[in-house]
UniProtKB/Swiss-Prot annotation:
One of its GO terms (cellular component) is virion component. It is found in: Virion. Its EC number is 2.7.7.48. May exist in multiple phosphorylated forms. RNA-dependent RNA polymerase which is found both free and covalently attached to the genomic RNA. May also contain guanylyl and methyl transferase activities. This is RNA-directed RNA polymerase. Pfam families: Birna_RdRp_C, Birna_RdRp_palm, Birna_VP1_thumb. GO terms for molecular function: GTP binding; RNA-directed RNA polymerase activity. It comes from the Viruses. It catalyses: RNA(n) + a ribonucleoside 5'-triphosphate = RNA(n+1) + diphosphate. GTP binds at residues 259-266. Residues 846-881 are annotated as: Disordered.
Amino acid sequence: MSDIFNSPQARSTISAAFGIKPTAGQDVEELLIPKVWVPPEDPLASPSRLAKFLRENGYKVLQPRSLPENEEYETDQILPDLAWMRQIEGAVLKPTLSLPIGDQEYFPKYYPTHRPSKEKPNAYPPDIALLKQMIYLFLQVPEANEGLKDEVTLLTQNIRDKAYGSGTYMGQATRLVAMKEVATGRNPNKDPLKLGYTFESIAQLLDITLPVGPPGEDDKPWVPLTRVPSRMLVLTGDVDGDFEVEDYLPKINLKSSSGLPYVGRTKGETIGEMIAISNQFLRELSTLLKQGAGTKGSNKKKLLSMLSDYWYLSCGLLFPKAERYDKSTWLTKTRNIWSAPSPTHLMISMITWPVMSNSPNNVLNIEGCPSLYKFNPFRGGLNRIVEWILAPEEPKALVYADNIYIVHSNTWYSIDLEKGEANCTRQHMQAAMYYILTRGWSDNGDPMFNQTWATFAMNIAPALVVDSSCLIMNLQIKTYGQGSGNAATFINNHLLSTLVLDQWNLMRQPRPDSEEFKSIEDKLGINFKIERSIDDIRGKLRQLVLLAQPGYLSGGVEPEQSSPTVELDLLGWSATYSKDLGIYVPVLDKERLFCSAAYPKGVENKSLKSKVGIEQAYKVVRYEALRLVGGWNYPLLNKACKNNAGAARRHLEAKGFPLDEFLAEWSELSEFGEAFEGFNIKLTVTSESLAELNKPVPPKPPNVNRPVNTGGLKAVSNALKTGRYRNEAGLSGLVLLATARSRLQDAVKAKAEAEKLHKSKPDDPDADWFERSETLSDLLEKADIASKVAHSALVETSDALEAVQSTSVYTPKYPEVKNPQTASNPVVGLHLPAKRATGVQAALLGAGTSRPMGMEAPTRSKNAVKMAKRRQRQKESRQQP
């Protein structure tokens, strides 16, 4: 194969097949195989230039906010609930935690890595070996058809026109400005309550488009959402003997960035700190709520002051998303990920993940449900969708996050929300949180959450991730819409798409390419665009049956030419037909498949990267995965991947590497690993393995808290419009019940203690007067406590009702900087005296710092002195007898 360009006959064949006409001094290989691409220099690679660009485009750059220095504290002091964890072999908690509670402060900075760059152009090279293998195989076919030629051409074009990498600062900044334009431009974002929706009416729409069930399972119920994170890890037994740990924390990618205040570290490296800060935030919030903060007509200054102390929980790192971008727009197109601070991610995940992970409800298992949540195209999934399309009833729709699919007039429409996250307002997220709390965290109508969690979900979390801020270089800048990648991104986007479908139903379902449909943008303040439309969709799908070619799933042979596909763009999947199975089966959209083949991502898992032999193992996984997701349908790509995977296998075997051990972790090595989650995949593609992968199986049974209206979204939309739906008990009522139950349980406990005391000290007529009076005194004391607790319960319950009835979102105001040169001042990153009451956390932890000059040290700010005095008073009160 290495000689394919050395043979005159081969060069002549290649030239003729691909229309290459080399001039003097050129050869065929140079013209067909793209050279190493050197990206253009980034014009915004400095804080001052980036700040200036943003300001010139009307983008808000914020006054820099400083962070307290991290200080070390013993883990057992900060997390006494989890002291047992450090006694377990392989425990993840370190002996000490590094917490942001120091007296000195600094301005944080974050400089993302952009690759490839002018300095490192070959950071993610294209797969030239695969291209040469395909050219070699092409030359072996005496009369190669146009389909085979197209495979080589498509791979070559992708290598030439695209590059895999993380873009540029200019691309990130351009994306920010585009997000702002969506949020504030021709169709500015609109709060749903101002459009006539209520949280309950939106929830009733989501009952159809995203039905959810309770967290946990029948045989293992989930604990209520009433605890701090450290109490979600429950030890039963003795760590020195037999024990079991019940883990009620959400699943989190511990290899991802930890965010502020731990720039450059992963969540796994700061798991203790993540739990500790979340604990403290929720406990402080609970304390302030009990004091009346946030209730109707009360002073909110304490709550806003606390949120100001924790400002970093609303500031994500602006992380460039690595993708396969067009070289022509390399400078200006980079997608951003809002890398949330790990405590923020943990707390919001504690609300969303237990419910959503246990709600496998979609169009496959619930009649009338248009959701594609947890949809998998394999095992007959795509065939069910094609059958749905072929059914004569229409118009009809499917929805997943910011993707909408509509069949209308025998035409298939794939619609995307335009920069979906930018369309989200804080009220949209409030509605999403309302839905998760009232539909998911509910046990037969009773709430499984308390006032603290309801207030966090409804009144605080939306401000942390929507219209918040981000850090890039040393600039703190505003974000418009929700930060992409936060723990509520999916449900927020799904809610937006649901509102679009609701308006479509109320308009009597016009064609998506009509002006009437387009007017939904203005009405809702939600932008969208038609990504793909296919006319005569039923005819084209039926043609696949007639045109299916012999192949792995049609005759059990290697394909000699590809079967035709219909590119539905259904979450990236197309449809083709299997004669052997008699069903439609999924293949990755052709453009996406060949783009993935052109540019490998490489080993992204840092813990696997250091393993000897991992690069060869990655090749095995990559090539076989490409075949599984659709490469099996394209003769040259299939054969080239098969040959290259075989060569990598033989290399590992010759070196004595444990291939089975590597392949056991194949989902960590493949970008398509999620598509095969839960499947027992053998990474050797054969007719049998492909048939097993695509053989239809019954869908998972649904798990819902309330029955879904089989009339579908249209029936619910019309019923809401005409008022036939009753507005059921809202969140405030559930919080009232949750808080009352919690507080009145305290009263019941106090009363029980009094009764227990009475039983333990009977009124013995022979007892002396002193003993009888002591008994009476104890009983009166306990009864008085019970009475006070009961009264307090009623008062706090009333406050809770008023607090959550409010639709306001609590957030401090952060000033904008007018001069970009000030915002990008190089002093950022230096340490300076504390300027705000960040000691609130230190005070409640009982952890303070001291200076040689004491509390009145001149380098301390007024707030730092105030917090030091508070800690001193607390210390003195603890020392009193």
